């Protein structure tokens, strides 16, 4: 069904509405939920037929990878753009961080903000992304303990901080890292809905770059990296959706394709974002808080309503509140769409650690595993 026809005349719902209302409302997007395959239904059957032949597992169609339609140079440009775009959005947005909307305005990378940063310096969004990128670069895969330890070094010692100290960290992230220090893998916190902050969404680009050949690996590893600090269901849902959108953009999709509704198994709030309702909302209907649903919706709204990297970042940052995180999230997808080549050269030159960030993105690009690990898993499942 055509997206514009589907949404025409519909009053966009507030994603802060009660769960019961949202669940009922989201039924209109049931066509975006995949049907259970015969193979999966057979394995889920409470009373399976004893003599029925066991159907082989196959990868569902909705997890099909997008073939890369870019030249190698274009693909690297977009990969670097996703990670550098995160840092640039962070550095631009920090000026208005914690400010009420329209109490100030930013039109350039000027620093300042609550932490009185120099122009080009960034906050915890980028620091965490660099910890994640370092994990992939050093291990050639995602490793929970390596990532958690890197995050602790940032928290305690200022590693991967633009100014050598951890001056900004979310409460949920702090609690998780202290839990890791105390209990290691035995710690299983931050599952509550009240912990559904944006801390793992804002650092996601390294996973999408490293797993660029496989949508299924991107989908699941978006959740795995999140689980180090954020395990609430809504965070996992938003990370999966955003990871899938980054996968499309990194492999050549334009804005319309990357942000178009796709068949995906998502719960109501993420499903409604996937359906694209944010595209029809006004600025007044968009929230820019640290709640993961607000952050993702605001970032996608800013990218959808612009046609270049600079304008997307400024539109996101000027929403204020958690401005750095909204702009960092917008910067990931805008950078993956427009590449470093589409960024203002003065921002690329000014943002802290610009060369290192681009080199790290290139390293993840080169290390990206070929093929689809889910296909290998399924081929050996019988």
Curated annotation (Swiss-Prot):
Annotated segments matching region ADP-ribosyl hydrolase domain: 81-373
Protein name: ADP-ribosylarginine hydrolase Tri1
Reactions accelerated catalytically: N(omega)-(ADP-D-ribosyl)-L-arginyl-[protein] + H2O = ADP-D-ribose + L-arginyl-[protein]
Reported phenotype of the disruption mutant: Decreased fitness in interbacterial competition assays against S.proteamaculans.
EC number: 3.2.2.19
Region called N-terminal extension, residue ranges: 12-72
Pfam family of the protein (one): ADP_ribosyl_GH
Cofactor list: Mg(2+)
NCBIfam families: ADPriboarghdlase
């Amino acid at each position: 069904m055509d997206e514009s026809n589907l949404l025409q005349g519909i009053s966009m719902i507030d994603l802060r509405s009660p769960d019961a209302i949202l669940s009922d409302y989201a039924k209109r997007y049931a066509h975006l939920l995949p049907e259970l395959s015969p193979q999966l239904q057979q394995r889920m059957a409470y009373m399976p037929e004893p003599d029925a032949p066991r159907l082989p597992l196959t990868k569902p169609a909705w997890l099909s990878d997008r073939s890369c339609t870019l030249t190698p140079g274009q693909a690297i440009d977009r990969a670097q753009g996703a990670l550098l775009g995160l840092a640039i959005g962070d550095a631009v947005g920090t000026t208005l961080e914690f400010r009420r909307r329209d109490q100030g305005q930013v039109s350039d990378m000027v620093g300042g903000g609550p932490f009185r940063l120099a122009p080009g310096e960034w906050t915890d969004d980028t620091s965490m992304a660099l910890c994640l990128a370092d994990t992939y670069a050093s291990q050639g895969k995602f490793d929970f303990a390596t990532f958690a330890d890197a995050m602790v070094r940032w928290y305690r010692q200022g590693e991967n901080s633009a100014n050598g100290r951890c001056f900004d960290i979310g409460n949920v992230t702090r609690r998780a890292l202290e839990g890791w220090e105390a209990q290691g893998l035995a710690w299983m916190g931050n599952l509550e809905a009240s912990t559904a902050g944006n801390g793992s969404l804002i650092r996601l680009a390294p996973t999408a770059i490293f797993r660029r050949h496989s949508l299924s690996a991107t989908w699941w590893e978006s959740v795995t990296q999140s689980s180090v600090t954020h395990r609430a269901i809504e965070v996992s849902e938003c990370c999966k959706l955003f990871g899938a959108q980054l996968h499309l953009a990194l492999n050549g999709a334009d804005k319309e394709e990357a942000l178009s509704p796709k068949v995906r198994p998502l719960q109501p709030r993420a499903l409604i974002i996937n359906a694209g309702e944010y595209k029809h909302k006004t600025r007044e209907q968009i929230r820019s808080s640290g709640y993961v649903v607000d952050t993702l919706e605001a970032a996608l709204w800013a990218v959808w309503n612009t046609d270049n990297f600079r304008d997307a970042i400024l539109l996101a940052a000027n929403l204020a509140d958690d401005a750095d995180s909204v702009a960092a999230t917008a910067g990931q997808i805008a950078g993956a769409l427009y590449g470093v080549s589409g960024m203002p050269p003065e921002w690329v030159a000014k943002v802290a650690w610009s060369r290192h960030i681009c080199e790290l993105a290139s390293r993840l690009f080169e290390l990206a595993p070929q093929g689809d690990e889910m296909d290998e898993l399924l081929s050996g499942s019988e």
